[in-house]
Amino acid sequence: MNKPIIALDFQTYEEVETFLAKFSGETLSVKVGMELFYSNGPVIVEKIKQQNHEIFLDLKLHDIPNTVKSAMIGLAKLGVDMVNVHAAGGKKMMEAAKEGLEIGSPSGKRPKIIAVTQLTSTSETDMQTEQLIKTSLLESVMHYSNLSKQAGLDGVVCSALEAEDIKQQNGADFLRVTPGIRLASDTADDQIRVVTPEKARLIGSSNIVVGRSITRANDPVAAYNQVLKEWNA
């Protein structure tokens, strides 16, 4: 999934269909998150796959290892390209998640699996006062990244601001998938650690996830092409 990943932050397939129709003939990388998946079920993935788009299924699993393993067996059968868990679930949970994907993958080739470190809506103060993690935000992200690597995962979800440090610690092949991407003309909304596609490329992101800058644009195709231009420059 080398192209910018478009976050399909919609509730209905009709909205998705209308949006994707604007990109007729183009193969996209898209993110199906909780809102869309929980509103429509697995059929939403099947319909998008029928259009040959790559899918990052963003459900952020976080439960006991056996439950996550069983859930991943089911998700693997959907044929998506990437899934994720919360690194806070621990090393054993992440190992179980990967094992579940390997068991459930019908073709023998499992989806990529990455772990969420800290949400891009979380500030250092939030983390320290609400999660009672007394390190710096960067130290927390780096710890979770290292734990994910030890568990055999393919990478992490992180802010672009931490991407270069993770690349140095865990290697260039370890994915650094970064949400919180906005075009310079857009607002940050509810995300705290936000950068442009160009800056994300320059400071070490391996993949970017872009939602509102594209889906809420007056001309989504033009906005996507602008993101693509900055990302590939």
UniProtKB/Swiss-Prot annotation:
Key word Transferase present: no
- The reply to whether Lyase figures as a keyword in the UniProt entry is yes
Active-site residues are K60 (proton donor)
Annotated residues for binding of substrate: 9, 31, 58-67, 120, 182, 191, 211-212
Q: Name one GO biological process term.
A: 'de novo' UMP biosynthetic process
Q: Which SUPFAM superfamilies match?
A: Ribulose-phoshate binding barrel
E.C. no = 4.1.1.23
Task: Report the catalytic activity.
Answer: orotidine 5'-phosphate + H(+) = UMP + CO2
* Gene Ontology terms: cellular component: cytosol
Spell out where the chain crosses the membrane: none
SMART domains linked: OMPdecase
**What are the record keywords, sorted?**
Decarboxylase, Lyase, Pyrimidine biosynthesis
Q: What is a GO molecular function of this protein?
A: orotidine-5'-phosphate decarboxylase activity
Annotated metabolic or biological route of this protein: Pyrimidine metabolism; UMP biosynthesis via de novo pathway; UMP from orotate: step 2/2
Q: Report the sequence similarity comment from the record.
A: Belongs to the OMP decarboxylase family. Type 1 subfamily.
* Subunit architecture: Homodimer.
> What job does the chain carry out?
Catalyzes the decarboxylation of orotidine 5'-monophosphate (OMP) to uridine 5'-monophosphate (UMP).
User: What is this protein called in UniProt?
Assistant: Orotidine 5'-phosphate decarboxylase
